[in-house]
């Protein structure tokens, strides 16, 4: 197993398959990626995952952009499935209604689906497209095939903070987990108008949840808290992702990232942490040399918030 200088094991690899997306959410951080021209081929992704698996990284999440707009998404899942124990995908849900069965058959375990609002006008304002009904159909299909299904709600002040309980009820209705996510930005953007306008702190909400939850659990990843809330005769699982200035969050991060253009990246918010792995792979690097690149990346890891 890979362990960084701060004693944090690295067990998860988050792979961006593309920087492109069929929506245009105004807040999207695009996994912290800069513009690049290279695109990893399925066999290249497979080899990198195989190396990662040898090093104890057994959980992989596929992201984007929107990963399902890649025509070879099913092939990619099928290729990397043998090397991992948990294979998940983060999606905006627009293609799920038609793709869900193929993704499941290829070996996908579970999905996270972005859903910031249940209001069609707001959805179009946030994403640029009027496709909420299509996404809801995809969510309903996914909950029949995958477990668990997580709905990702980025909470934004003045936009959807009034819908938190509506989303909790909806998650209960479709038997999904709701993840409430704070907007996160690097230090240099904390004084930006964007952050001032839209950041909605979730700590007060967690305090409210603590009073009414029938059960509270803590995940190993980031020490995120999961609240089991009684709503409309059901118990709904709500997970809170609160990263800004959260030192506990950073000290319990077990992730390494792989950008769509083939760089290992140690932290979403850093801009100085890219290590090229696709270039050496294409230039004939041996497995041992690729292992060394992973080890170098892990040695570069350090908590962002300290």
From Swiss-Prot:
EC number: 4.1.99.22
Official protein name in the record: Probable GTP 3',8-cyclase
Source organism, top-level taxon: Archaea
Reactions that this protein is recorded to catalyse: GTP + AH2 + S-adenosyl-L-methionine = (8S)-3',8-cyclo-7,8-dihydroguanosine 5'-triphosphate + 5'-deoxyadenosine + L-methionine + A + H(+)
Residues involved in [4Fe-4S] cluster 2 binding: 250, 253, 267
Organism: Pyrococcus abyssi (strain GE5 / Orsay)
SMART domains: Elp3
Keywords: 4Fe-4S, GTP-binding, Iron, Iron-sulfur, Lyase, Metal-binding, Molybdenum cofactor biosynthesis, Nucleotide-binding, S-adenosyl-L-methionine
A GO biological process held by the record: Mo-molybdopterin cofactor biosynthetic process
Function as written in the Swiss-Prot or TrEMBL entry: Catalyzes the cyclization of GTP to (8S)-3',8-cyclo-7,8-dihydroguanosine 5'-triphosphate.
HAMAP family xref list: MoaA_A
Entry keyword Nucleotide-binding: yes
